[in-house]
């Protein structure tokens, strides 16, 4: 199994962690914005039924 030859520096570790955190924040903001548009009824990219049908037993 391959093993790295040198230890990762602290600065490189911070850079990688920072980019990972930024990506997660961007995704969470995007999903929150999408949820807001769906709940407010202004969404143009989703089609969903607005009438509620009662549960029917067969």
From Swiss-Prot:
Domain of life of the source: Eukaryota
Main location: plastid
GO molecular function, one term: structural constituent of ribosome
GO CC field: chloroplast; large ribosomal subunit
Keywords linked to the UniProt accession: Chloroplast, Plastid, Ribonucleoprotein, Ribosomal protein
The UniProt record lists the keyword Transport: no
Gene designation: rpl32
Family the UniProt entry places it in: Belongs to the bacterial ribosomal protein bL32 family.
Organism from which the protein derives: Adiantum capillus-veneris
Protein name: Large ribosomal subunit protein bL32c
Cellular compartment(s): Plastid, Chloroplast
Gene Ontology terms: biological process: translation
